[in-house]
Each structure stands twice: as C-alpha cells, then as structure tokens.
C-alpha cells in the first residue's frame, strides 16, 4: 500500500525532461508494465503520485485546475515534454531559413508530433510543468509551444542538441528562448543597417555596370555577410580584442575589403581599371596576384572602441587559408619574451573563417583545421565560422556536393553550435552574429553561422547560371534584394519614409561616382612586365658568422643534461643523454640531435623564440631528439630548454596531430604573424610532406612574390634511401627544387652535425629582416648517429655554414684529377664511407668529391673556384640515390652544363627513371646502391650504359 507523506513534496523539483521521466516511471509503477528505478519506486511508495496541482491561466484569463494524477494526464504531460524537446532539437526542420524555398510543408516528424495534442490538451497543462524557465506571460503548455515555435522555426534555426557540455547547452537554449537575443534594434541601428546594405549592393552594382564582364565574384545574395562581420568585429572590440583575423575565399571578398576593411572605393576601382592612384599602398609582391586574392590590414574603430582587422591573403585553393589564419591568431595571443612556454591570452585575438557551402564539407583541410581547435598546441580560444551559403558550388547543386542535409553538418562532430539563418532577414542575421561572439568569448570555443542565401549571378560574372540551374535562376531574377526587402520593412514600420530611403540610395551612388572620378586613366605602359626582385632578396643570404664560444656551448650542454631532483628519467633515454656528456671535450664527437639542441639553446639565449611541431617531434621519429623528458613514475614532462640560464625567449615543442596540410598551414601563419620566431615543422618522414603540397605551392614558396608576405618557416623533411620502401625514402626534393626561383627559399641536404648547427643559427639571424626566406631541409635518418656526420666542438665554435664542402684527403694532386663528383646528403656520405672502408681499390688521385650542402641557391662561385684548380679535368658527374626523374638531377643538369663549359663532359650516375621513388626490396636496394657508389668512384667506368642496374650517361 502507498504511504503518503503530505509534509514534503519532492516532485516540485522536477521540470521538463526530468519531469517527463518521473511521470513515465510512475505510469510503469501503477500499471506494473515494466521495471521501475528502485529509488523512484521507494519515493512513489512514500509520497504517492507526482502531484503538480496548479491553477492554469488560459489565454482568456480564466483559471482552471490541473492535476496529473490520472493516466490520461500523465501521458499528455509526457507528450508535451517530449514535444518541447523535439522543438528544441528539430525545430530547424520547420524553419524558413532558405530564401529560395518555402517554409517546411508540415510533413516532418515534429509536425506530426504537434498534431497528436489538441489546443485544449495544451491549455490544461501549466507552463512551468514543461518549461521551468518559462518567461513572463507564458502560462500554459500551449503558450510554451507557440513561444518555442516562434524561437526555433522562423528565420533563425538552431542545432544545439549535439553539444555535449550540459552547461553550454543550457546557456545556448536560455539565450535563444529568452528575449535577450532578439531585442528590437533601435531606429538608429536599423537605419545604419539599411545604409550598410545599400552600400554593399550599390558597390556591387556599380562594378557590374562599370567593369562589364570583369571577374569580381559578387557577394549579392549573401549581402548580409558584411553586416554580420561588422557586428562580430565590433562586439569583439567591445570585449577588448586587439586583433581579429579573417580568412575567406574570393566570393564577396571585394565587398569585405571595401566595407569591413575600409579599402577606399577609388583604390578598388583603380585595380579594375589598371590605373595608378595616389595613396594606394601596394600589398602585393613583385609578381602580384589578382585583386580578389589580396588581403589587407586595417584598424577599424567607432566612437568607443577600435581593433586591428587582418584579412589574410588567399589563393583560389579553397579553405587552405583556414589553418594559416589560425596560426596568425595564436601568434597574436602569445607572449614569447620569457623563458619556458609562451604565455597565451585567447582574449587578445580571434578568428573569423568564411566558408563556402560546397567547400566546407568538400575540402579535407576543413576537418583537419577543426581538429586543431581543442588541441593544446593549436587552440586559439574559439573560431567563429560563417558559411556564406549560396546553395551552389560553381555549377554543382548541393545534392551533388555533399551527403548531408546541411553544409554545416561536419561541425557537429567537433561539438560546435550551429545557427542557420535566412540571409534575407537582416536583424536575424545580426542576432546570430551576437550569439556567436558571446559564446566564443564566454566558452572559448568554436561557433558556426550558416548564412543561407543565394548567388545572384554565375560563379563569375561571365557565366550564365541559367544554363545549369534554370529553375532557381528564374526565381532569383524576380527575387528582391535584401536591401529592398529591408527598406520595405523599415518603411512599413514607420522608421523611414520613401524619400529618406531614396536619399540613402542616392548618397551611395554619388559617393561611388565621386570616388570613380578620382581614378586616373589606365596605365598602358609595359614597365610592369619587367618584374624586379628586391635587391635584398636577389643577393641571397650573406655569409654570417654563426659560431658560439666553446665555454658557452659547454655550459649549455651541462644544462641540457640536468633535470630536477627526484625527476625519474627513463633509463634508456638517460643512457642516451649521458653519452653526450663529454661530446664537447677534446676527443668528443657531437651527433645531430645534440648539435640541434645546442643550436636551439644558443638561439634562445640570443632572444629568438622557437616553436617546433610535428608528429612525434618531442622525442623525434627516430628516437634521437629527447627534448622533452617524461617522468617514469608520474608521467610529468620536463624540457631542459625551459630552465637554461640567460634565456629571454620562449621555447615550445609539440607533438602534432596526424595531419600535414593543416599543421604546415598553421605554422606558416604563426611565423608570418610572429616573424621574430624560429618556427619549424617536422615531417614524420619526408615522404608524407606531399599531403601539404598545396601549402608549399601556394604559400611557402610563392607568398612573398605574390603578396609580399615574408616567412622564415623551416621545414625538416627526413630523407634518404635505406631500403625502407617507397613511403619511407624520399621527401621529393625535386618538387622543392622545381619551385625554387628568385631566391624564394633555401633548399639544403646536409652531411654533418656542425652544418646543421650553423644553418639553424643562420636562419635565426635573418628572421624579421628583409633577407628572410623559408628553409627546406632534407634531414637525415640513418645518418643521425653515423660516424662520418659527427662533428667536433671546434666545428661549432668556429666558422659558419658552408654551402659546399670538399671531401677531405681528395684532390690533393690537382693536375691528376680527371673526374669531379658532385653529390648531396646521404649519397655523399655513402661515397665517403666506401672510400674510408678501403674494401675496393680506386685511383683516388684522379677523383675529387664536392658535397653540395645547399642545393638552392646553388653555390656556383664556390664550385667554380674548385673546378679552376683542376687543369686536366675531363668530366663533372652528378651522383644521386633517387631515380633520374626525381632527386636533384633535372635541377642540376643545366647548372653542370654551364659549369663544365665546352671542354669538360657532364654526366649522371644513379637509378634510372622510375614511377615509384623506391623499390620495396632492401636487398635490391643495397645492390643498386653499391653499384652507384662503385661506378661513381671508378674513373675507368667512363659512362657505360647498364640499364638493368643503374643509369650512367654523359652529354
């Protein structure tokens, strides 16, 4: 028998979904139709049925008495509770968020659920029973449903149910369900919004009529993108944000430049007209780029606040700008002027990424970049994403470009709140923008706005979109612009009259005409055809003394081999580190990893911050670096580079996610925005770097020539043929050499630890100067501890980087030398090892070997001076481990021909052309390598052909 207790009522604490659960359990308890939670069963026995008697005030202000005691009421309450949650979760399916489509037709699951309850049923249930935080004026469940439908099924639609954090989810629902998000705008702000839309539309239409047929990738159809960006930037500035970084593609970019970044109309028109105008500051390099790829930096302000806005330069490779801009933001957030890890303040900057509706689900770089958003090494405290959704990608409809309902669905997997908004409802768009910036500033996480509009013209202004989308373009042709729609709304609301609206339009037109009149005639001279590389770039990097005093190196080494008392270093690692103890003494030898650590420490002591990331970079792919130690008992980490004395710069080394493209883009962006920092990206194996090829092609190699965007990024690409197959042999140096021109970067393949030490220090010395450029290093694997790559302390304390090195003990009898062998990296060490082994007899008096340490720019003067010593030279040979169609041969061949002149032959020794970089059989590899070495050292071989083994030929 039920024991009722009338003194305490625990059921009053339950509301909404929790109430629904209790009612459902009580129904099972009464009917015996299923198992009941034991704790609830005990409460039912003590307190009886959930009693929520209340006076319900209906719409006609009459009070009715409601009690859920009977089973029928229990079922109705449960259905209402479920309906409330369904509206919150699936209201977006009924929302009118696409201006080119009618509102949902009522056939959805949600609509059917609504039809299961009559208005009378809903009027009988108190609002508080199903919505604990029901605002004032909401009395019944019918009021609740009407209110929630108004919130969730109009021109704003929300997807929050996938958010895992209950606090965030509750905050989001509270924000949209309360009146705080959709407070009526003041007449002043509504008028300003109309003026902004008039400027955007007027600018685009002026371009359309004035520069007929010229590509501009119009914003029309998603015009509200500009006011949305305005709102986010302004609200960010009010929150004290110092830098707002924007990444976007070409669609709408010119309007964003002109309005959000305040680029003068006259400067925009001059670019279309190909005219020179006074005051225009070139934000491009010596080759330049099309106008809708260029970026801009501008301090944007109003009467109260200001902030710096940076629109990143961007290629047409969609979405690849995303990680670059994230790198900008992290660099702006970090203080790198103290030892240890940099200090990050995510309130100093944030990112806005404008995506395309086809590119967001289509480009893998998007998900790679989203994956960075919560990682310690890459998070920037939240990015605001805006999909400029015009429902078509060039000529491809959405049903052919994605497998999901919405273009934004990818974001759900990363726990990102999503708001869909009709781009024809300006005030709803601003509400979405406000929610986005508030969420980002409060929770420090990403937020996405799906701005759904259309594309008024074709992909570019020369396309006829009706060819491929005839029906929708019939609609678009007759569809009013968002400016016209909003103007009518303001006129109907009495905010402005027709004359005032016309005055706004005329003012915009007069401003455009006036600015166009300032543009001089087109510059038809051909002077710009002759591109001139800046002298400081053309001269290359000057020779720099990069030695460090021996006492300083010894002190550094002592610090590198120290760790806090009680810190338990893994025994195997401890043994590796202890081997380095005497490396700088008289008979000591310095291996590659120690040379790197010594270089890092000395660079830090000179005030240059360092950031190194890559897969497994803390330990090193080949268990060589050990720059971060792990306590075997606590798993705490410690880096000696954080505790060395006399350091006034930060050091960070991070293991990256299993991504190349996003991480390379991020590190490039970080370095561009923090030019004083030595930023390094390390591939796990150089073979895998080609998944970031678009970043190498579009940014790292060409960014300065196109945009004047300087970078000193270092790429560490493990390279070397050791019989490990086609995925663990080649960093594809041929590709970096193919991109090499105009001294755009340095490409090197080194043969000693000292050379690595000096080139790192040289790179650090040019950071933040006009001489800066990226450094591409083919780094060793098997050579990391090879005896012939070890260096002495004096080789670090004295001298500088040498672009070319002569093999010791060769060429001592210049008149006898007939063959000059040029090689690089591991191939050069293999030749040296064969000579040192003494296994075979060679006439070494007739041969000399030069190691080309710096492949680009090629050290021509140095090599020429060597050649001049050998009066009887007959042949210059390039020897490489890669197949002939790969490696450096096709880059080196014309250089060799020029060096040799008319009397000296040139030749190649190496593997023949192959489609795969390496074979998979280690025994075959070894046999081939031995043949290459023996043929290179055997002067008598004299260029015989042996196609089955290796390829040897001359000119």
UniProtKB/Swiss-Prot annotation:
Protein name (record): 2-oxoglutarate dehydrogenase E1 component
Highest rank taxon of the organism: Bacteria
GO CC entries: cytosol; oxoglutarate dehydrogenase complex
SUPFAM superfamilies (UniProt xref): Thiamin diphosphate-binding fold (THDP-binding) (SSF52518)
A Pfam family recorded for this sequence: E1_dh
Gene name of the encoded protein: odhA
Family to which the UniProt record says this protein belongs: Belongs to the alpha-ketoglutarate dehydrogenase family.
Free-text function comment from the UniProt entry: E1 component of the 2-oxoglutarate dehydrogenase (OGDH) complex which catalyzes the decarboxylation of 2-oxoglutarate, the first step in the conversion of 2-oxoglutarate to succinyl-CoA and CO(2).
Subunit (UniProt): Homodimer. Part of the 2-oxoglutarate dehydrogenase (OGDH) complex composed of E1 (2-oxoglutarate dehydrogenase), E2 (dihydrolipoamide succinyltransferase) and E3 (dihydrolipoamide dehydrogenase); the complex contains multiple copies of the three enzymatic components (E1, E2 and E3).
Catalytic activity, as annotated: N(6)-[(R)-lipoyl]-L-lysyl-[protein] + 2-oxoglutarate + H(+) = N(6)-[(R)-S(8)-succinyldihydrolipoyl]-L-lysyl-[protein] + CO2
Entry keyword Oxidoreductase: yes
Cofactor list: thiamine diphosphate
GO function term, MF aspect, one: thiamine pyrophosphate binding
UniProt keyword Kinase, yes or no: no
SMART domains to which the protein is assigned, alphabetical: Transket_pyr
PANTHER family in the cross-refs: 2-OXOADIPATE DEHYDROGENASE COMPLEX COMPONENT E1 (PTHR23152:SF4), 2-OXOGLUTARATE DEHYDROGENASE (PTHR23152)
Its EC number(s): 1.2.4.2
GO biological process per UniProt: glycolytic process; tricarboxylic acid cycle
Xref: InterPro entries: 2oxoglutarate_DH_E1, 2oxoglutarate_DH_E1_bac, DH_E1, KGD_C_sf, ODO-1/KGD_C, THDP-binding, Transketolase-like_Pyr-bd
Keyword set, alphabetical order: Glycolysis, Oxidoreductase, Thiamine pyrophosphate
């Amino acid at each position: 028998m039920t024991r009722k207790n009338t003194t305490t009522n625990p059921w009053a604490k339950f509301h909404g979904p929790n109430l629904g659960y209790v009612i459902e359990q009580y129904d099972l308890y009464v009917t015996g139709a299923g198992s009941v939670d034991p704790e609830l069963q005990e409460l039912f026995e003590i307190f009886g049925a959930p009693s929520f008697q209340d006076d319900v005030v209906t719409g006609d202000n009459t009070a009715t008495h409601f009690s859920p005691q009977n089973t029928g009421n229990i079922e109705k309450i449960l259905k209402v509770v479920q309906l409330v949650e369904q509206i919150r979760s699936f209201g977006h399916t009924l929302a009118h968020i696409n201006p080119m489509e009618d509102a949902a037709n009522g056939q959805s699951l949600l609509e059917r659920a609504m039809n299961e309850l009559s208005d009378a049923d809903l009027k009988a249930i108190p609002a508080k029973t199903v919505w604990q935080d029901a605002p004032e004026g909401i009395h019944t469940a019918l009021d609740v449903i009407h209110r929630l439908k108004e919130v969730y099924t109009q021109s704003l639609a929300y997807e929050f149910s996938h958010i895992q954090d209950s606090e965030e989810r509750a905050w989001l629902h509270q924000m949209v369900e309360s009146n705080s998000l959709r407070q009526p705008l003041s007449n002043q702000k509504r008028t300003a919004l109309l003026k902004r839309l008039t400027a955007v539309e007027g600018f685009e239409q002026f371009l359309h009529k004035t520069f007929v047929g010229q590509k501009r990738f119009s914003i029309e159809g998603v015009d509200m993108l500009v006011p949305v960006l305005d709102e986010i930037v302004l609200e960010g500035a009010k929150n004290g944000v110092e830098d707002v970084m924007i990444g976007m593609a070409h669609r709408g970019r010119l309007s964003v430049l002109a309005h959000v970044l305040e680029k003068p109309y006259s400067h925009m028109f001059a670019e279309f007209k190909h005219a020179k105008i006074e005051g225009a500051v070139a934000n491009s390099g010596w080759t330049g780029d099309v106008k809708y790829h260029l970026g801009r930096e501008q301090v944007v302000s109003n009467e109260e606040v200001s902030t710096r806005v940076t629109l990143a330069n961007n290629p047409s490779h969609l979405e690849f700008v995303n990680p670059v801009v994230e790198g900008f933001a992290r660099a702006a957030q970090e203080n790198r002027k103290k030892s240890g890890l940099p200090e990050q303040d995510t309130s100093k900057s944030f990112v806005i990424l404008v995506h395309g509706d086809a590119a967001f689900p289509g480009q893998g770089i998007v998900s790679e970049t989203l994956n960075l958003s919560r990682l310690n090494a890459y998070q920037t405290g939240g990015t605001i994403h805006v999909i400029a959704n015009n429902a078509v990608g060039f000529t491809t409809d959405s049903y052919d470009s994605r497998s999901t309902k919405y273009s934004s669905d990818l974001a759900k997997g990363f726990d990102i709140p999503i708001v869909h908004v009709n781009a024809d409802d300006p005030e709803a768009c601003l509400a979405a923008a406000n929610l986005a910036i508030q969420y980002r500033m409060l929770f420090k996480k990403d937020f996405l706005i799906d701005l759904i509009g259309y594309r008024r013209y074709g992909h570019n202004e020369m396309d006829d979109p009706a060819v491929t989308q005839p029906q929708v373009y019939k609609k678009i042709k007759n569809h009013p612009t968002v400016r016209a729609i909003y103007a009518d709304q303001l006129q109907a609301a009495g905010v402005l009259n027709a004359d005032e609206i016309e005055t706004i339009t005329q003012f915009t037109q007069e401003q455009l005409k006036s600015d166009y009149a300032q543009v001089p005639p087109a510059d038809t001279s051909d002077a710009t055809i002759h591109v001139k590389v800046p002298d400081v770039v053309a001269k290359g990097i000057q020779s720099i003394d990069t030695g460090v005093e021996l006492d300083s190196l010894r002190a550094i080494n002592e610090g590198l081999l120290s760790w806090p008392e009680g810190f338990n270093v893994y025994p195997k690692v401890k043994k590796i580190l202890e081997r380095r103890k005497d490396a700088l003494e008289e008979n000591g030898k310095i291996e590659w990893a120690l040379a790197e650590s010594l270089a890092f420490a000395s660079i830090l002591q000179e005030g240059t911050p360092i950031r190194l990331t890559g897969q497994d970079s803390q330990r090193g792919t080949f268990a060589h670096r050990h720059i971060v130690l792990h306590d075997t008992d606590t798993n705490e980490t410690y880096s000696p580079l954080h505790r060395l004395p006399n350091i006034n710069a930060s050091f960070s080394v991070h293991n990256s996610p299993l991504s190349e493209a996003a991480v390379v883009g991020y590190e490039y962006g970080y370095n561009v925005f923090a030019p004083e920092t030595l930023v390094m990206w390390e591939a796990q194996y150089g073979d895998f770097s080609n998944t970031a090829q678009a970043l190498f092609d579009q940014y790292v190699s060409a960014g300065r020539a196109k945009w004047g965007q300087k970078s000193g990024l270092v790429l560490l690409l493990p390279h070397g043929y050791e019989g490990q197959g086609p995925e663990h042999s080649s960093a594809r140096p041929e590709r970096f050499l193919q991109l090499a021109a105009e001294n755009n970067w340095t490409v090197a393949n080194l043969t000693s630890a000292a050379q690595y030490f000096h080139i790192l220090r040289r790179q650090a010395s040019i950071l933040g100067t006009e001489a800066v450029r990226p450094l591409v290093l083919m780094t060793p694997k098997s050579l990391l501890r090879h005896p012939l790559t070890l260096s002495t302390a004096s080789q670090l304390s004295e001298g500088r980087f040498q672009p070319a090195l002569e093999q010791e003990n060769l060429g001592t009898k210049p008149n006898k030398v007939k063959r000059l062998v040029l090689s690089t990296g591991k191939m050069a060490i293999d030749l040296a090892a064969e000579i040192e082994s003494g296994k075979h007899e060679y006439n070494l008096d007739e041969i000399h070997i030069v190691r080309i340490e710096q492949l680009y720019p090629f050290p021509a003067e140095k090599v020429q001076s060597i050649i001049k010593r050998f009066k009887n030279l007959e042949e210059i040979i390039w020897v490489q481990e890669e197949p002939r169609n790969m490696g450096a041969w096709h880059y080196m061949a014309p250089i060799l021909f020029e060096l040799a002149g008319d009397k000296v032959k040139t030749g190649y020794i190496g593997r023949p052309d192959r489609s795969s970089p390496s074979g998979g059989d280690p025994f075959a590899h070894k046999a081939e390598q031995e043949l290459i070495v023996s043929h290179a050292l055997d002067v008598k071989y004299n260029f015989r052909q042996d196609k089955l083994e290796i390829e040897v030929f001359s000119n």
